[in-house]
Amino acid sequence: MTHEEFEKAAGYWKKKDAAGKKMDRGTLTAAMETYIQAHNTCALATGAGTFVRCTPIEYSWHDGAFWIFSEGGLKFFALERNKNVCLAIYDPYEGFGKLNGMQVTGTVEIVEPFCNEYLKAATFKKIPLEALMKLPSPIHLIKMTPKHIDFLSSAFQKQGFDCRQSMEF
C-alpha cells in the first residue's frame, strides 16, 4: 500500500462517523455499561517502543473504571514505560447482522496493594482478603480509566442509529 492508501484506510471510520446517526450520550452510556457488565474478559493491549503485548485477561467494571487483578507478566514491562493502553471486549463472530464489540482506549495506574482502593476492588470481585494476604507476593491491581470507547453493535441499526458509536470521556 502507498502512504496515501494507508491514510485513506486509517481515516475510514472518522469519515463514516461524521455522517452517521448518533445516540444521545445517556442512551449510549447505558448500552455501554450493559455490554461491559455482560462480559468479564478482555484483550488488554500494551506497548512500549517496539515491544507490544496483547493479554486475554479477566476484568471487573465499577466506579467508571476497569479493574484487573494480575500476578504479573510481560504486560508490566510495557506498563512501566507507557500508561496508555487499549482493551477489546467482543462477542464471537456469527455474521454481519450480529456484530458486537468494543474497543476502549485509556490510561492505567497500578494500585498499591492493600490500600483502600485495592481492598474495595478485591471485595467487589469477592476475593477473600485472607487469601490475598497469604500469597508470597501480592497480586497486582491494574486500574484502567477509559478516555475513548468505540462500540460496534448491529442492534444499533435496528434502533435507527449507526452501527458504530463512539464516546469521549
Regions found by a protein language model. Name each.
Residues 21-41:
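Short, basic/aromatic recognition patches
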Residues 48, 90-95, 131-137:
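A short, aromatic/hydrophobic, helix- or strand-capping loop or linear motif
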Residues 72-75, 147:
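A generic "binding-loop/recognition-motif" signal
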Residues 25-29, 72, 125-127:
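Charged, amphipathic alpha-helical segments
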